[in-house]
Amino acid sequence: MTNFALKKNKKSMKYCTLIIAFLLFSCGKKEDVLLPKSNITIVKEVQDLSPIYIFFKVEGKDTIAEVNRKSSIISTNWILNIDKRLPLKLVIPEVMKLQEKKRADSAHKNENAENYYSYADSIGKNLSFLPFTKVFYKMEKPTAGSFVVYFGKGKKRVFMGNQEIKISEILKHFYSIKFVKVPDLVFLFDKNMSYEEYIQYKILLQKDVTQNLDTLPVEFIF
């Protein structure tokens, strides 16, 4: 397996094209973050960044999401490097805590700073980045009255109501319905899907759906 290395200068850090797993060394201990893969590039490069890591850990029979944000600076772009093996139900609560911390720190806030998920670009053989700054998460069921797009675990199956559809057809289907009152469009992800599967869904959504929206749907994890 090849590795993605990190290179830092005075004002910016750039990811170099070398790996699919991050190797971190601290106190003689090696820690890996196995990244999701995709053959679609969303954002190729991010500068002025802070890396944050969420590791896959096992303690007894329990899986743990362990966060390392020692290098994070509020005013920079945050890159979340998250292990693809973690279930979404463990990842998103940690992501929400990080979002809340950054949004609440008005003293050091930079309106231009973004948050990104990193993933391995299998075409460019380097890291690519997926923005999620404006995404709001909820660890619950959507409220009644919302129009739910459901993303199932394991088979890349997407449903609107009882109808299975392609991700590229979500907006076409939504706008074709003659609502008396247009409901909020929301996304619901199976909490037991892997983070890798979630990112693969999100990359397709960014490509075909959300880049065409002014306001992003709230994402429910349940």
Q: Where would I find each of the regions flagged by the language model?
A:
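Bacterial Sec-dependent N-terminal signal peptides
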Residues: 1-36
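Long, low-hydrophobicity, acidic/polar, solvent-exposed interaction domains
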Residues: 28-222
